Swiss-Prot record:
Pfam families: PS_Dcarbxylase. This is Phosphatidylserine decarboxylase proenzyme. Its EC number is 4.1.1.65. Binds 1 pyruvoyl group covalently per subunit. Signal peptide: none annotated. It is an enzyme of class 4 (lyase). Pathway: Phospholipid metabolism; phosphatidylethanolamine biosynthesis; phosphatidylethanolamine from CDP-diacylglycerol: step 2/2. It catalyses: a 1,2-diacyl-sn-glycero-3-phospho-L-serine + H(+) = a 1,2-diacyl-sn-glycero-3-phosphoethanolamine + CO2. The record marks 181-182 as: Cleavage (non-hydrolytic). The modification Pyruvic acid (Ser) is found at residue 182. GO terms for molecular function: phosphatidylserine decarboxylase activity. It comes from Burkholderia ambifaria (strain MC40-6). It is a peripheral membrane protein.
């Protein structure tokens, strides 16, 4: 199933409008010779805020990737948001990736918690615990707990989350956005089988991160 939304993320509309107005004004005054860098900037802003539809795998026990990017961690560690030991899989997004976040599983949101913090390079490990972040804890119908954490980065300094505790989420459903480079950590129950490896390029909703133990 696909979840309809604008192909250009609504979070980017103000930025696109500002870039377009500036480019048009400079073009009107000085011509294309002066305006071309601003048209180029407009193209960059539009591509940054693109938010394409993605196919969603049908496997019921699959954990879907919540964001586009590259895998930077697959490890067993402590999940501080659900107070348990867990399998953590981390996705780093650079400024050229799509920056919307989508639910990795079907379930109910049991907790949403925001933490202020630093703005370190999101590709490094300590960004998980020291950077500004927003944690979403989801419980599936089978009782499994999946935690998805939006983490701000060196450039990204605005985390947006559109769900609250008690609300349902469907796999692949868009729930948040981080502007200009960031990271998402996913914590899974021990026994889950990772289906990705470090360095692998992944895509929101269409890449299977892991399989939950049945």
């Amino acid at each position: 199933m696909n979840y309809p939304h604008p192909i250009i993320a609504r979070e980017g509309w103000p930025f696109i409008a500002i870039a377009a107005v500036i480019a048009l004004l400079i073009h009107a005054v000085g011509g294309f010779g002066f305006a071309w860098p601003f048209w180029l900037l407009l193209v960059f802003v539009v591509q940054f805020f693109r938010d394409p539809q993605r196919p969603i795998p049908a496997q019921p026990n699959a954990v879907l990737c919540p964001a586009d990017g590259r895998i930077v961690a697959v490890e067993t560690t402590q999940d501080p948001y659900a107070n348990r030991e867990a399998l953590k899989i981390s996705v780093f997004m650079n400024v050229f990736n799509v920056h919307s976040q989508r639910s990795p599983v079907d379930g109910a949101v049991t907790k949403v918690e925001y933490f202020p913090g630093a703005f370190l390079n999101a590709a490094i490990d300590k960004a998980s615990t020291e950077n500004e972040r927003n944690a979403l804890v989801i419980q599936t119908a089978s009782g499994k707990t999946v935690t998805a954490v939006q983490i701000a980065g060196l450039v990204a300094r605005r985390i947006l989350c559109y769900v609250r505790a008690g609300e349902p989420l469907s796999r692949g459903q868009r729930y948040g956005f981080i502007r200009f480079g960031s990271r998402v950590d996913v914590y899974l129950p021990l026994g889950s089988r990772a289906k990705v490896s470090i360095g692998e390029k992944v895509y929101a909703s269409s890449t299977i991160l892991a399989e939950l133990e049945q």
